[in-house]
Amino acid sequence: VAETGVTCYTCHRGQPVPSAIWFTQSHEPQGSNFMGDKAGQNEPAAVVNLSSLPNDPFTPFLLQAKDIRMNGPTPLPSGNRHSTKQTEWTYGLMTHMSTSLGVNCTYCHNSRSFSSWEGNPPQRVTAWHGIRMARELNLNYLEPLQATFPSNRKGELGDVAKLNCATCHQGAYKPLNGAPMIKNHPELVGKPAPAQVASAKP
């Protein structure tokens, strides 16, 4: 990542299974559906800093590609159909990111206008790419291992362990506080991707 790189230790920290992993949650205990659907809320969990927010913000955003942006760019809704309930899922992910990196909202956002990218710190772009990186790793590398993982390494719904921000960051704004991993492990550096040349059509 950037100029520092990552190794197995970045996530594993000397353990066979990284400490910060997640599985898709089964929100409703069997037989409780006659009392209504809590939608994964009001069950405090460490991943959302023990708040009442939905406690599995990872499945919709780091496994699926649900819309994270909730507020519109205009004072009135003007076609924005996102609800408060949907917004709470976004807040759940943002709370997780905040605690995982040891930062607050203004590390990535200009709180004057959350809907605008103008005037935001460069970390917002990094976070945008980080969300997509986590999703790609979950979908393209971990999910295909479903049949390989033994049953004792799977979640309650039979899914494999997946990663989120805390898997690598573990409370630091840069994993391992930016320790240079490439310097001691140059053999892990992949070959640069070939440059794409646009073909000129007559």
Locations of regions flagged by a protein language model:
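Sequence context surrounding c-type heme c attachment/ligation sites in exported
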Residues: 1-202
